[in-house]
Structures are given as structure tokens and as C-alpha cells.
Amino acid sequence: MMLMMLPFIGSVSVSESLVAMTTMCLVYLILKFFQTEIPEGLRRLPGPKPLPIIGNVLGLGSKPYLSLTAMSKRYGHVFQIQIGMRPVVVLSGTGTVRQALIKQGDEFAGRPDLYSFRFINAGKSLAFSTDQAGVWRARRKLAYSALRSFSTLEGTTPEYSCVLEEHICKEGEYLIKQLNTVMKADGSFDPFRHIVVSVANVICGMCFGRRYDHDDQELVSLVTLSDEFGRVVGSGNPADFIPILQYLPSAEMKNFLRINEHFTEFVQKIVTEHYTTFNKDNIRDITDSLIDHCEDRKLDENSNVQMSDEKIVGIVNDLFGAGFDTVSTALSWSVMYLVAHPEIQERLYQEIEDKVGLDRMPLLSDKPNLPFLEAFILEILRHSSFLPFTIPHCTTKDTSLNGYFIPKDTCVFINQWQINHDPELWKDPSSFNPDRFLSADGSEVNKLDGEKVMAFGMGKRRCIGEVIARNEVYLFLAIIIQKLHFLPIPGEKLDMTPEYGLTMKHKRCHLKATMRARNEH
């Protein structure tokens, strides 16, 4: 996080810097003087002693999820650090997190009013907005309903399908052809480069009813912007934690604004096109579904929450922006793990061959018959923990947790990485072992163990796209494992070191893939 301070150096005069530092020192001393009183019967939060102005930033390092996990061993599952001038409560341990986000869900359902969050989707993002009142709930419910209507099977047998499945099957088939072509031409491929475009095409199909060529510059540009967005948000903006910096010029913040404006312009253009071709009797995609709902609400005089055209753009922007980063990261990591563990890759292929066969594509309805694949995905989410934290929460009122007093409007970090690597919860947590989720005979996934994995948050702010994301990861993997055998490049070491961000990516690399013998054309 200290690295994020660097863009300010050199862009501000010495006199401006001195004024800013003096102001921050005065504010810090005033805040220390008026320190919150602790109600009788409760304790003050433990935690490391902060430095003036910068707080505990130096102690977080480049991998804050590891640093905060180490701190939890010393201070417990509820402790406080200070980032810049903002107090932050860090929660770990599955029992503590469930208590906060489920049993005391209303008290921890807020989002902190971070400066950078105000510019995400014009401050009206479902995921980042501080709002949690009626309008926010109505928009969240509407977005969830629209997602479900295009991604839910009406039955559990192969003859049933849904829009999500159709798009994944189409893109999965194209991805296999694309990788085969690249392998013949270049001898290797960048897994992230091709997977992310395929996944982006699925959400484009769901939201906009269109797909793009893998080399389409507009789509490639948006994918790149999404990657930048995750990096900036994950690193933390200094102005979020030292308010005076909001008024100083920042190249990084200027770039962040550009990213968000580009996303909004892209979605606005497509939503406008949908309005001109909208037909109530032919709902083509999620955007049409939202427009239809909006028109119905405008005609309904008794409706408590009117949905403006601007809010439709906001919802679609949210769904599109979040619709491919998590899934593409999960799939890219999955391919890396397949290469790192060839014996597991072979078991997965054998399961698909035995339960699905090789004469047709796997489908969503096959999922219950592929328990080892489901266990593999759970172990990917747990072991990689590429979503190390949830988006920060915030307390909505003065509250307490585990006997500690937490004031209203306190920023709260949920350390998902710690939960997924807690030795009290997992046997040998550092080892990659999908079998940990299977029943003794390997015939089914232990649901209780699966629910221990934390990747999509919990409670009122839980990711609305979780079910879709899990289904998408499952079906893409089943399709490519059935057709392709992934291999490392001879002589090159596979680097599984994560790079920190909102979603942690592996380092870009190249791999090899061959068509399975019975799938050769």
C-alpha cells in the first residue's frame, strides 16, 4: 500500500507537502485526544501500535493477507490496525466472521465511504456503494432476478438448457479451437489471455446478446481495463485512508477515473442501442429484462421504487464488470493447478469420460455426477484464495463482537485467506488436496466442508453472482478437460506465486496443450 503513495511524490511542491503534513499531524493529534470511550463491560480492540499519519501501513508489506493472518495469531480473530488515519477492524476465523456477517448481519452490512468508491459506477455500484437502504435493496433484488432468469435450468436432465449454458458451450468450443490453432502456430499459449476473452464473451452474451472476436480491440481493451481496475482497488488508494490527499493531484487516481468512465461509456452506448430496438415480446438478454422491468415500474403508480434509465446502466455496468474477472481468474488458476498436478488432471478426465462420455459436451445437468470436479473447484477456491479479502465492510451502528467495542462507521476487513488456510479448520491447509471435500467412498461432495470455503463473502453483501460463477467455472472446466491435455513447457518452472490485487492473478506465462487422442479430427 505504501507503493500507492509514490504517484504523489514529485507532483506536489515542497510548501504544499509541508502544509498537508502539518494539517495531517494536527488532525491526528485531535483524533487521539477525542478517542472513543469504551462502554462498560466491553474491551478496547487489541492491535499493533500505529505510527502517526501512516498508521500500520509499513507492517502490511506486499502481501497484506499474510501479514494480517500473522497478526491474528497474536491479537486474536478481532483486532484493529490503522491504515493512514483510518481505523480498520480485521476479522478472521470462521466463527467470528459468521457471527459478524450473518448473526449480526445488519450491523456489519455497510460499506465504508472510501474516496475511490465514489467513482465506481458514479457512486451507485451494487458492490461498492455505501447505500444499503430501500433503493439499493430493490436494485440488488432486480439484478439478482435478471441473472437467475437467464441462468437457471428448468429441469435436471440433459434436454433442459438455459442461456448461460448455451453461451458457455459455444465459447468453450471456440476456446478449444482457438487454443489448438495457437498451439499449431506458436507451440504454446498464454492461458489468461485466451480464457479471459472467452469468459468476457459469456457475460457479453448474457448482458448484451452479442459476442466478440478474440482479437476485437474494444473487448481486449475492456479486459485490460478490468485488470487495471482490480490492481488499483486491491492496492488501496492513499486518499481513502488519508483524507487530505483527496485534494492533491494524483496520476493514479486520474487513471482510476479514466477506467471507470470508459466502462460506463461502453455500457451506456449498448443500453442506448437496446432502448431503440426494445421489444417487450422479445426479451433478448439481461439489458432487455431490466428495461422491461423499468418500463413496468414507470406505469405502476403504486410502485415504491422507480427504476431510472441511469440506474439500468449502473446495474448492467456492475454485472458486466464483475461478470468475468472472478470467473476468468478462477479458470486461469485451475489450468495452472492442472499442469502442476498431472495425476489430478488425469483423474478429472477419467471422471468425465466415465460419467459423461466423449460423444457430447458436458452440461450443467451433469454436475451432480462429477463430484471430483466439484471438489477440485472447491480446493482451487480454498488453496489459491485468489479473493483474499471481501470488499471492505463497515459497521452501521455502535456494536460489539467477541466482547470488543466497535464504533459506528468503522471500516472492517474480512480475511478470507486466513479462513481458507486456518489449521483449526483444515488438515494440512498448505497442501493441494481435492479429496478433502469428498465422502469416504468418493461418490459425493461433503456439503458442510464445501460451505467452509470462503470466496464470495457472506451475509447481506454476499456476491449475487456466486451461483452463476460456480456454474460457469464448472462447465468451462468440464468442457476443456474433456478435450484438452494441459502440459508445462519442458525445462520451464511453473511459477504459482500470486500477484496481489482485488483478485490475485498468477504471473503471466505460457503452457502447452494437446487434443485428447479420441478428440482428434
UniProtKB/Swiss-Prot annotation:
GO terms for molecular function: heme binding; iron ion binding; steroid 17-alpha-monooxygenase activity. It is a peripheral membrane protein. Its EC number is 1.14.14.1. It holds the Pfam family p450. Belongs to the cytochrome P450 family. It comes from Pleuronectes platessa (European plaice). Cytochromes P450 are a group of heme-thiolate monooxygenases. They oxidize a variety of structurally unrelated compounds, including steroids, fatty acids, and xenobiotics. Substrate binds at F229. Its cofactor is heme. Heme binds at C463. Disulfide bonds: none annotated. It is found in: Endoplasmic reticulum membrane; Microsome membrane. Keywords: Endoplasmic reticulum, Heme, Iron, Membrane, Metal-binding, Microsome, Monooxygenase, Oxidoreductase. This is Cytochrome P450 1A1. It comes from the Eukaryota. InterPro entries: Cyt_P450, Cyt_P450_CS, Cyt_P450_E_grp-I, Cyt_P450_E_grp-I_CYP1, Cyt_P450_sf.
